[in-house]
């Protein structure tokens, strides 16, 4: 018996050789077609792993220091409480100023209403702004309780005014619009 010609062992090297050639052809073809994409993907994955591992170690280190240091936790809580107290004091001061302004505005409004009522009782204009104009001019009349009659004025429009007919005078009169396109061009 020969060692190299046994019936079960003779086919094995040929099958391994065919498998090796098949694998080499398949991998070689994939690398020749997609080699640059594979290389670029590996580089991107490498940098992502580096970035994520750095972030992960930083996060783990920060959680260790915050959890293990109770004095720091107490100091932070006290600082937060002090900041809240300071903001609350400021808010209370602003609310107090707002209330004072509202009271002043209400008092001013009440005073104006009283002045308007008094002026209406005297027969004067109810407008407060008119009072400033009247106070600026010296009063010649001794009887201020009797209002002066208004002078006769002509009507603003004629009694037969109709804007559709254009008979009211003036330079502008209504005219119906033209039919057709508003801008030039052929309508062909």
Swiss-Prot record:
It comes from the Eukaryota. Pfam families: Selenoprotein_S (PF06936). Residues 136-147 have a biased composition (Low complexity). Residues 116-125 have a biased composition (Basic and acidic residues). Belongs to the selenoprotein S family. Involved in the degradation process of misfolded endoplasmic reticulum (ER) luminal proteins. Participates in the transfer of misfolded proteins from the ER to the cytosol, where they are destroyed by the proteasome in a ubiquitin-dependent manner. It is a single-pass membrane protein. It comes from Xenopus laevis (African clawed frog). Keywords: Cytoplasm, Endoplasmic reticulum, Membrane, Selenocysteine, Transmembrane, Transmembrane helix. Residues 116-188 are annotated as: Disordered. The lineage of its organism: Eukaryota, Metazoa, Chordata, Craniata, Vertebrata. The chain crosses the membrane at residues 29-49. It is found in: Endoplasmic reticulum membrane; Cytoplasm. InterPro entries: Selenoprotein_S. GO terms for cellular component: Derlin-1 retrotranslocation complex; Derlin-1-VIMP complex. This is Selenoprotein S B. One of its GO terms (biological process) is endoplasmic reticulum unfolded protein response.
